[in-house]
């Protein structure tokens, strides 16, 4: 679809009381503005223009980074003077040379709008029969929204703001303005300069385009959202929480329909870019953030947080934090495991209780069951690491690697001082400090030999009592 989306994201968002741009606040781990940009891309818009103003540098850096590799052109245009929504659209048109095709203008704080809604909205002006359509909705409580009054011909007669409604209008006019507009690009470009600023705020308001277009004999109509939630915006932290709950419910209901079990769907937070395989069970307080892929027949949670992580099928992820990790099939993690970026758990491996792994590969069937730190390590298949074992990978300046061969056995409370090399089938005695390579099938022993002194303890206690008598 050769349509352009203009996303208005220049506002201060003062009611958020934040040091950051309003539309950068996250819902399920994803900035609001990214929700709406992604919706326009999925809808088939060929170009997306984000109008920025408040915190412009922060917004530009985010948009440029997030969409650097996007097949759809996503660009930022700065509105240096915040002179209203009409002025913001004019700035976008002039900066990008937009003069034809459908143009949809959306607010950057509408994270719940779907790609399907955007596509249908843009299509309303694609034939040229309508110069503009206004997105409308019928929320359960319309208070605060502008009300739509239609004429006998189905065109918009006027938009009546809440403060201007009579009691009868407030009771009978339940269709509300969602604040989004679709334009025929040629008509928009031809008449945008006719918007005036003769109002109390001396601003240029985009809704004035409706009367301007009607004055030129152009048809103006409405596009009604089937789901009113598509048109809900965020102006406060309270609304941010409310829309987060709606997004959560939508996503969880989708995955339940796809064969995923949620023990309590109100207590699981699944991001929009996550995917979950059928017959997986999601326990309470599970968070999937960013690009997370989970296979079939897994147990997720309780109390697990996965960020940009891939999980295979048949895994147990119990009270685990995993960031930028790859977890293959049949892996057991937790409780209270921490998988840091660069961790790769191969099939059937285990990271158990109070285990931290960073930038390491844990071989097929290998186990790190409890109370260990494994960093910058390549571990072969069939390895067992005893409790309290650590790879000492940092010398104060540089990180060093450890290599543990297949079928090695690392005794409890072992310190492997990197760079360390443990050969295939080697055994490292408990309590060892390993500073030299251990050959394959050898015993590595790096501790003082035990000495038993007969009678020493009894003599020691006797001397303590004698001291007390002095």
Summary of predicted features, one role per range:
Residues 1-18:
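N-terminal nucleotide-binding beta1-loop-alpha1 segment
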Residues 1-4, 31-123, 465-466:
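Conserved N-terminal catalytic core of the sugar/cofactor nucleotidyltransferase
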Residues 9, 52, 107, 136-137:
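Short beta-strand/turn micro-motifs composed of small residues
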Residues 20-26, 78, 195-198:
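Short glycine-enriched, charge-decorated loop/helix-capping segments at active-site entrances
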Residues 45, 100, 129-132, 218:
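Short, high-confidence coil segments that cap the C-terminus of an alpha-helix
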Residues 57, 113-200:
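Conserved core of the sugar-phosphate nucleotidyltransferase
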Residues 157-249, 253:
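Catalytic-core segments of class I nucleotidyltransferases/pyrophosphorylases
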Residues 261-445, 450-451:
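Structural signal for interior beta-strand "rungs" in well-ordered beta-sheet cores
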